Amino acid sequence: MTDAAHSSQTGPVTELTKALIARPSVTPLDEGCQTLMAERLAAIGFNIEAMVFEDTTNMWARRGNTGPVFCFAGHTDVVPTGDLSRWHTPPFEPTIIDGYLYGRGAADMKGSLAAMVVATERFVAKHPNHPGSIAFLITSDEEGPFINGTTRVIDTLEARNEKITWALVGEPSSTLKLGDVVKNGRRGSLTANLTVKGVQGHVAYPHLADNPIHKAAPFLAELSQTHWDNGNAFFPPTSMQIANINGGTGASNVIPGALEVMFNFRYSTEVTAEILIERVETLLTAHELDYDIRWTFNGLPFLTGEGPLLDATRHAIRQVTGYDTDPQTTGGTSDGRFIAPTGAKVLELGPVNATIHKVNECVKVDDLEQLALCYEVILEQLLC
């Protein structure tokens, strides 16, 4: 059954999600998504502050002038569509089929954004004089290089000592059904770009060259087998994965002059980036390699333990869905890593993530409406 057949039956969250999906906001574009949200929020008393940094559109919206500050955080940008011929429906023409809303960004994360807005509208209507503040931190640079997005907004807020108490990020945390998993932390991320130097030459005259691939092979073997830590009750053991490796000219008769290797750590709170860097560079020295290495720090690990935010989220999911959630720290990074270092408690709660970044991305229509109910209950638990 098509969208047209369902249009009269869809709820307010689904309708707003459709309006957002229809804006082709491939990162770092926003395409008016934040304006649409801002209009709805301004109508219920939010002060809207646009923060544009180079090609990135950000929005800081706040209702209230006192603490505590509850912040909804998310992004309006989406990943590219991929092969259009593999989509059942056009990715920027939101379509409902058999109870699922299809479109790029349906699950990641325009559905969450719509649920946040609708939940806030309902909450403010019931509690116009609520204590504390409600805020929205929205960016169009989460799926891209994450240079001019949330991190720049946080820098601005920190410079004027404007603090967030609790942040709820709308990333699609659920796995099999809505709310079965929330993310109450994330591992740190550290990337290395390593160049091992050699001497280029003819393969028939190896004594006149120095093969960096041969030299680096024992190091790479040891690196891949190194045990970094045991993890802990909240985080799995630190993982290192080689992501890219390149050497040679493409010719079969040339010994390469350099080998380039990119590898990434996803690390627990049992180690620090500094410890990992020291151990890798000690290993490089032990293998007597001539090398250059560039480190890129992508985010600290963070953890939101027992407390008001986790309690409120557990209560909301149980009340709306009838089952308990499972807090986890697995998966990739999110913009929560930029908010947590300020001292804010951060959680991620959003739709099922089975189709994110794929062709035919979709979200269950009923889940969108239930997600807004979860968000509303969380607001009531924390600000009433």
Curated annotation (Swiss-Prot):
Task: Fetch the InterPro entries from UniProt.
Answer: ArgE/DapE_CS, Bact_exopeptidase_dim_dom, DapE_proteobac, Peptidase_M20, Peptidase_M20_dimer, Peptidase_M20A
- Metabolic or biological pathway, per its Swiss-Prot or TrEMBL entry: Amino-acid biosynthesis; L-lysine biosynthesis via DAP pathway; LL-2,6-diaminopimelate from (S)-tetrahydrodipicolinate (succinylase route): step 3/3
Query: Which reaction is this enzyme known to catalyze?
Result: N-succinyl-(2S,6S)-2,6-diaminopimelate + H2O = (2S,6S)-2,6-diaminopimelate + succinate
Does the record's keyword annotation contain Amino-acid biosynthesis? yes
One of the entry's Gene Ontology molecular-function terms is: cobalt ion binding
Q: How is the cofactor bound?
A: Binds 2 Zn(2+) or Co(2+) ions per subunit.
Q: Where does Zn(2+) 1 bind?
A: 75, 108, 171
Active-site residues, as the UniProt record annotates them:
77, 142 (proton acceptor)
Task: Look up the EC number in the record and give it.
Answer: 3.5.1.18
**Which family does the UniProt entry place this protein in?**
Belongs to the peptidase M20A family. DapE subfamily.
Role? Catalyzes the hydrolysis of N-succinyl-L,L-diaminopimelic acid (SDAP), forming succinate and LL-2,6-diaminopimelate (DAP), an intermediate involved in the bacterial biosynthesis of lysine and meso-diaminopimelic acid, an essential component of bacterial cell walls.
Subunit text: Homodimer.
Q: What is this protein called?
A: Succinyl-diaminopimelate desuccinylase
Gene name in the database record:
dapE
